[in-house]
Structure formats: structure tokens, C-alpha cells
């Protein structure tokens, strides 16, 4: 069996018994498993923590699994998502695949089939860039705030009391963490992450 000890799985299901059983099953792979009773709780965690695989049920109170899938892809387009659907619910499975799901798993869950699909997804999700999906530092967030305001690297350097080279480094790391290669996609990703209430440069003056 491959080593999955460095990978993180988010599992979402509103039934506590299912969460408990699935968590124990997934932990046998060695991966770190975080379970959520509501899709919105999972989405909140996705905005700040790295996740290598998201597994979600479809029919849940509040935000459904399909809605979570759609929002998760806005936050982390590279994230593989597996959707659990009821037996024979083909239309739902088709919707999930069209929304960006890597695969779907039918209920009732067959342990062998379930683990096989999960392992395939984890192998596929191994990030090429070690920074991809990591949380932004306070300085990177402040830099991003000024960048989104239209400030140049030189202006940002002056406001944050850093060298231009340091700002360029922060900018490069920020784009790598968010999985983007240009400013347009950076703006879109920042909006998807809800980065609207960012700290002002003044709050970071002591972090020099």
C-alpha cells in the first residue's frame, strides 16, 4: 500500500454513524481525515486549510453535496472531489461529474470498492508544487490586498517596508499557493476565497 500519511481527506455527511465508520475506514490508509456534518463547515475549512481529497454525500440539509462541489472548485480548482450518491441515482451522478467531480460512489458503500476509488484519487491528487493549497501568511495576504488595489511591486514594497525583491518573492509564493499563473486568475481566486476583509499594511508594520 502506498504511503498517504502526508495527505488530508475531508469527508462530509450529515449522519454521525456514517462519518464514524468512513473515518475509521479512511484512516487505515494512513491519511489524516477531517469529518464535517454540514457542507458549509467543510467549505469554511477549505478556505484556510490544505485538502488533498474531498468526499461528500449529496443529499444533506442546507448546502447539498453538488453545491459544495461547485463552491469547492472555485476555491481550489485542482482539488479532486468524490461524490457519494444513492444506488441507481444516475442523473445525480451525471450532475456531479459535469460539476467537476472526479468520480462518484454508490450507496451502500462497498469497503473494497470505496478504498480503491479513494486510493486512485489520492495518487492523482499528489501536488506537483509543494506550496499548492497551503494557507497564506499575514504578509502574503497584505501584499495581495495591495496588489488587488492596483498597486505596483514598488508601491507595495514601500507600503510594507520591504525590498522589491521580497515583494516579488511573496507574490510568486502567493500565486503558487493559489494555483494561478496570472493576475486575472489571481483576482478571481481571491474573490472565490472571500478575501475581502484583509488586514491593512499598518497592522503588519511590527512583523518586519
State the predicted function of each range:
Residues 3-18, 22-26, 54:
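Conserved acidic segment of CheY-like receiver
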Residues 37-38, 64-67:
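Acidic catalytic/metal-coordinating carboxylates
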Residues 60:
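Receiver (REC) domain active-site loop signature in two-component systems and cognate sites
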Residues 175-208:
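Basic, Lys/Arg-enriched C-terminal extension of HTH/homeodomain DNA-binding domains
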Amino acid at each position: 500500500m502506498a504511503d498517504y500519511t502526508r495527505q488530508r481527506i475531508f469527508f462530509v455527511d450529515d449522519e454521525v454513524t456514517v462519518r464514524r465508520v468512513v473515518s475509521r475506514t479512511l484512516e487505515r490508509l494512513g491519511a489524516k481525515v477531517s469529518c464535517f456534518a454540514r457542507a458549509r463547515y467543510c467549505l469554511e475549512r477549505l478556505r484556510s486549510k490544505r485538502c488533498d481529497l474531498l468526499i461528500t454525500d449529496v443529499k444533506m440539509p442546507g448546502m447539498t453535496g453538488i453545491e459544495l462541489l461547485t463552491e469547492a472548485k472555485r476555491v481550489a480548482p485542482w482539488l479532486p472531489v468524490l461524490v457519494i450518491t444513492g444506488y441507481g441515482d444516475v442523473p445525480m451522478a451525471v450532475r456531479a461529474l459535469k460539476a467537476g467531480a472526479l468520480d462518484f460512489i454508490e450507496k451502500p458503500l462497498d469497503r473494497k470498492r470505496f478504498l480503491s476509488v479513494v486510493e486512485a484519487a489520492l495518487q492523482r491528487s499528489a501536488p506537483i508544487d509543494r506550496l499548492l493549497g497551503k494557507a497564506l501568511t499575514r504578509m502574503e495576504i497584505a501584499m495581495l490586498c495591495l496588489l488587488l488595489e492596483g498597486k505596483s511591486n514598488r508601491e507595495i514594497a514601500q507600503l510594507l517596508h520591504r525590498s522589491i525583491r521580497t515583494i516579488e518573492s511573496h507574490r510568486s509564493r502567493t500565486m503558487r499557493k493559489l494555483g494561478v499563473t496570472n493576475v486575472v486568475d489571481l483576482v478571481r481566486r481571491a474573490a472565490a476565497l472571500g478575501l475581502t476583509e484583509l488586514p491593512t499594511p499598518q497592522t503588519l508594520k511590527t512583523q518586519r
